[in-house]
Structures are given as C-alpha cells and as structure tokens.
C-alpha cells in the first residue's frame, strides 16, 4: 500500500516532531519581538532656505547645503516677507540628512537598505474671500536635485545622484486666515524612493520656479514651511531578518534534497503533489537566499524590485500549492487518469496567475522606472493615484476572496471525509484504526494550512501599510510588528519544512530484506506489522493510479472491497 511518513509515523514520534516545530515557531516570534526594533524608522526635517546663486542656477553639479564648511547663508522668513516678490526664483529649499543628534554627526549605514521621502507643503497667499477654499488638485512644479557624499569626503564634495523636474498635485486646506495672508496646509506628496542606501549622507535641493508665460507655480503665492519625512528600514531589523534567512536557508535546501531523493527511490514517477512540494520548496529557497548581504559592498538600487519579484514568486507558488493540495485530497476521483495541472486545476490557477501578473505590472511600472528616475511615482497624478489605489484594493479583495474559496475547498474535503467515515465500521479493526488515525492527522494538517493561509493574508495586508508600526506598540518592550513579520516568515519555512517531511515516502514501503543485516529488534516489529497489514490488503486489486502518494486518496476505492 502506498504511504507517506504522515500516515506511518508513530504517534510518539509525530508528537515530538510537532513539538519541535512549534518551539521553532515560538522562537521566530520572540526573535522579532524581543531582539528586533520596529521595521522602519523616520526623520522629520524642516527645510532650510538658501538664496540662489544665479550664476550657477543651471549647474546640476552645484549644491547648496546648510551644515558644514562652506554652508550657505540661510534666509530668514522676515527677509522673505520684506521682499515685494517674496524672493521669487531666488530661494532654494535645502534638506540635509540625516540630522545630527546631541551634537553628534550621524550617518546612514548600508544595513538600512532603502530610503523613501515624502513632502508636506505649506504656502501662503494674500487674504481674499474667494481664496479661502483653494482649488483641488493644484499642480506644483518642482526642480529636484539629490546629491550624496560619504564620510571620508569633504563637506562640499557633494556628487549628483539624480535630477528631475517633476509635477505634483496638491490637495490643500485652509489652516490659518490672517488679516493680510491666508495659510494653506497640503497633504503629503511622494518625493523620491531609493532602492539602495549606499552612501553616508544625502542632500536634497528643491526649487519652485515661477514662470508667468507658462503659468508655472503662480497659484501658490509663496512657500512657507516645507517638511520632509525620510523613511528608512531600521538597521537592527535588517540584521535580525538576515540572520533568520541565513539560518533557514540551509535547512530548507537540505530537506528538499532529502525529500527528492526519497521520491526517486520509488519505482514510479513523482506525483503532482510531490512536484508541487518541490516547486514550493524552490520558491521558498529563492526567497530565503540572503542576497541582501551583497548590498553591504555593492550599490544595488534594484534590490527593492528584486525583493518584490522574489516575494511575488513565492506568493504565487504558495497560493497555487494550497489549491492543488486541497484538490488532491477531495477524495473524489473522476477518472483513473493521473492528475495534472492542465486537466484539473487550470481554472483555479489562472486566477492566481492573472492576479500575480497584474501586481507585477503595477510594481514594474513604478519601481522599474525608479531605477532611472527615483523621483518618479505613479501616485503623483490624480489618475495614477486612483489606479494605484484600485490595484491595492483589488489585491486586498482578491486575497480575501481567495481565502474564502480555500476555506470552502477545505470544508468540502472535511465533508467528503465525514461521508466516507460511515464506511469505517464495516472494515476490520486494524484497518479501521489505521484510517481513523490518518483522518485525524490529515484534519490537523488542513487546519494548520488554514491558519497559515490566514496569517499570510494578514501579512500581505500589513505589507501594504505605509508605516511599519502600530500606534499601540510605541511604549511597550515587545515590538508587535517585528514579531508578526518574523513570525509569519518563520511560519512559512516551518510549514513547508513540515510538509516536505510528512509527505515524503515512508521507509515502511521498502522491502525489509535489503536491510536485514542492520535491522534491530524494534525495526523487526515494525516490518512484521507492515507485512501483516500488506497481507490484509493483498486481496485488493492493484491500484489503477500508481502515482498516488496518500492512502486517503484511494480510500473510496478500497472501502468497496472490505
């Protein structure tokens, strides 16, 4: 009789295995909750005002900076207000990051991986009744120049990283109405995104050119305060994350080699579920591969895009596996033909493929372009923002629908098992106990699958959040978000690790004569038990589907002969 380790492993050994895996799961949660900081940190920087040097206005290799030798002389708000034209086309807004702390110069490290900048704009206009409610979707033209230097460079040795003239659309509300001027505060707008944080210091120069013939920036009056929020991945979290990947990677590779070797020792071709398990293990191995170590020595601005692709491949493989995993255990065989993806699951998997391709197109349309222009964002235009929100909304709805459909499939599996259990009393006692044990173990595994799917959906939704923390975890020692992320990541590895063990072919199917010289007394008992069970089933006709790996899937045929 065909069998897997799940079916033939003793209850004591199975309990020990499950206990070890649960302990590893707890350790993954504790690793993120106790040792890792929140995944992301941020700096809030109020822009400094510097007067433009008209002789070098178009020189993209000239930068104004606010700290260090040769820093610009900053312009005060009183000087701006005193000028009739508010120093139009003479002001440069300067952001130098990171900020010093306690008179100590801080610098970015490559462990922080990436940097995202968002900008909040406040502008003023002469008070007038018709201007109290500004028009929606105001277009702002910004000349952006981003520079960098390293800790061994001179204070004035800034090098151009990127330059672009971009348009941003503002949604503003009145914040203060004065006797001579009305102030408006606008929603945050995306400014730039760096896929690699390779340098120590960064400098941002923003200009807001005024041009009457082109009607450029004329509807804003003059700028007041500009606030830049720079969001970076915490280096401490990156170290914990890479430690987790480095530990899990060799274990998954080792169990895949062990699993595939056992499959090939059988005198049959691998079953569909065995192929799916090895594909799933391969996708997880690709995700576990700690490529982020390369960013410590190389500048890899495409690492964010590569990480999204790796995670997308894993999600696609995991979602596909769950559908096939549940479908293969429906206990309904329409024909004796071997199950294939094309014949039985193409409708289910086509939805997963379409969804993953849609998300890939959305991702490549933004982060792919950002490799050339870090100031580009699909969120900058009203239409682009609506399309992006639509993609995220559809992704969330699709994830919820998928989870409900998976719950329905698992419910059908449980229902079919319940229907077939009515045939157990007519069986012999040995076989009845055998199948009751299989059903109990299988139900436990399916519930674990459902829990893994639920946490995966929750993790996917959390991954779409702009901020990497929850408001209620700011004053407690355990970082809930970090614990959740490392816990879910560890859960994927532990779950797939367990499947590769439990669905590997069992040793009890192998002829005992090949190992007679090494067999102990306990093993002889196992072989004798297996032999007696084989005699009990010997009157059954040969299985028409020799590729089945679980006796549960052949339960319906064998019941008829008891």
From Swiss-Prot:
Cytoplasmic side: 1-15, 261-270, 333-344, 412-441, 504-562
Record has Protease as a keyword: no
Residues annotated as glycosylated: 58
Membrane topology: Multi-pass membrane protein
GO molecular function: Wnt-protein binding
Spans within the Lumenal topological domain: 37-239, 292-311, 366-390, 463-482
Transmembrane regions listed in the UniProt entry: 16-36, 240-260, 271-291, 312-332, 345-365, 391-411, 442-462, 483-503
Composition-biased stretches (Polar residues): 541-556
Localization terms from the record: Presynaptic cell membrane; Postsynaptic cell membrane; Cell membrane; Endoplasmic reticulum membrane
Superkingdom of origin: Eukaryota
Chain segments carrying region Disordered: 539-562
GO BP of this protein: compound eye morphogenesis; cuticle pattern formation; Golgi to plasma membrane protein transport; imaginal disc-derived leg morphogenesis; imaginal disc-derived wing margin morphogenesis; intracellular protein transport; positive regulation of protein secretion; positive regulation of Wnt protein secretion
InterPro entries linked: WLS-like_TM, WLS_GOLD, Wntless
Pfam families in alphabetical order: WLS-like_TM (PF06664), WLS_GOLD (PF21883)
GO cellular component, one term: cell projection
Key words of the record: Cell membrane, Cell projection, Developmental protein, Endoplasmic reticulum, Endosome, Glycoprotein, Golgi apparatus, Membrane, Postsynaptic cell membrane, Segmentation polarity protein, Synapse, Transmembrane, Transmembrane helix, Wnt signaling pathway
UniProt xrefs under PANTHER family: INTEGRAL MEMBRANE PROTEIN GPR177, PROTEIN WNTLESS HOMOLOG
Its biological purpose: A segment polarity gene required for wingless (wg)-dependent patterning processes, acting in both wg-sending cells and wg-target cells. In non-neuronal cells wls directs wg secretion. The wls traffic loop encompasses the Golgi, the cell surface, an endocytic compartment and a retrograde route leading back to the Golgi, and involves clathrin-mediated endocytosis and the retromer complex (a conserved protein complex consisting of Vps35 and Vps26). In neuronal cells (the larval motorneuron NMJ), the wg signal moves across the synapse via the release of wls-containing exosome-like vesicles.
Entry similarity comment: Belongs to the wntless family.
Assembly and interaction partners: Interacts with wg; in the Golgi. Interacts with Vps35, a component of the retromer complex; wls stability is regulated by Vps35.
Protein name: Protein wntless
Species per Swiss-Prot/TrEMBL record: Drosophila willistoni (Fruit fly)
Lineage: Eukaryota, Metazoa, Ecdysozoa, Arthropoda, Hexapoda
């Amino acid at each position: 009789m065909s069998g897997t380790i799940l079916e033939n492993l003793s209850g004591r050994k199975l309990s020990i295995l499950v206990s070890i895996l649960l302990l590893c799961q707890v350790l993954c949660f504790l690793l993120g909750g106790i040792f890792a900081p929140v995944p992301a940190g941020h700096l809030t920087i109020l822009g400094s005002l510097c007067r433009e040097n008209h002789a070098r206005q178009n020189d993209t290799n000239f930068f104004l900076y606010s700290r260090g030798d040769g820093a610009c002389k900053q312009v005060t708000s009183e000087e701006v207000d005193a000028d009739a034209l508010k120093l139009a086309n003479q002001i440069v807004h300067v952001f130098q990051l990171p900020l010093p702390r306690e008179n100590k110069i801080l610098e970015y490290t490559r462990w922080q991986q990436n940097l995202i900048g968002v900008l909040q704009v406040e502008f003023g206009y002469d008070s007038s009744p018709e201007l109290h409610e500004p028009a929606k979707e105001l277009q702002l033209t910004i000349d952006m120049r981003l520079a960098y230097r390293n800790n061994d460079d001179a204070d004035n040795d800034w090098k151009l990283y990127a330059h672009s003239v971009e348009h941003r659309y503002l949604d503003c509300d009145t914040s203060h109405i004065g006797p001579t001027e009305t102030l408006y505060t606008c929603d945050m707008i995306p400014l730039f995104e760096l896929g690699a944080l390779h340098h120590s210091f960064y400098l941002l120069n923003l200009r807001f050119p005024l041009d009457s013939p082109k009607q450029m920036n004329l509807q804003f009056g003059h700028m007041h305060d500009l606030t830049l929020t720079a969001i970076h991945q915490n280096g401490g979290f990156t170290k914990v994350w890479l430690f987790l990947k480095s530990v899990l990677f060799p274990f998954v590779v080792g169990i895949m080699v062990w699993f595939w070797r056992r499959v090939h020792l059988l005198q049959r071709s691998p079953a569909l579920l065995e192929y799916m398990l090895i594909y799933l293990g391969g996708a997880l191995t690709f995700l576990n591969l700690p490529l982020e170590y390369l960013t410590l020595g190389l500048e890899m601005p495409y690492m964010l895009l590569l990480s999204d692709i790796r995670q997308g491949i894993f999600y696609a493989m995991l979602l596909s596996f769950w559908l096939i995993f549940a479908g293969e255990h429906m206990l309904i065989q329409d024909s004796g033909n071997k199950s294939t993806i094309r014949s039985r699951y193409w409708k289910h998997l086509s939805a997963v493929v379409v969804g993953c391709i849609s998300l890939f197109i959305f991702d490549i349309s933004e982060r792919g372009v950002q490799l050339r222009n870090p100031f580009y964002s699909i969120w900058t235009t009203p239409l682009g923002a609506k399309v992006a929100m639509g993609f995220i909304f559809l992704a969330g709805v699709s994830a919820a629908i998928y989870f409900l459909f998976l719950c329905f499939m698992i419910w059908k599996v449980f229902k079919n098992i319940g229907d077939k259990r009515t045939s157990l009393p007519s069986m012999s006692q040995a076989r009845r106990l055998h199948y009751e044990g299989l059903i109990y173990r299988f139900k436990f595994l399916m519930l674990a699958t459902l829990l893994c799917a639920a946490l995966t959906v929750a993790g996917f939704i959390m991954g779409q959040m702009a901020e990497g923390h929850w408001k209620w975890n700011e004053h407690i020692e355990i970082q809930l978000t970090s614990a959740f992320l490392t816990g879910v990541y560890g859960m994927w590895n532990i779950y797939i690790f367990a499947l590769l063990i439990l669905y590997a072919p069992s040793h009890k199917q192998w002829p005992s004569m090949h190992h007679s010289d090494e067999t102990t007394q306990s093993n002889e008992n196992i072989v004798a038990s297996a032999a007696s069970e084989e005699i009990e089933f010997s009157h059954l006709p040969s299985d028409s589907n020799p590729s089945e790996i679980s006796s549960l899937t052949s339960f319906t045929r064998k019941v008829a002969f008891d």
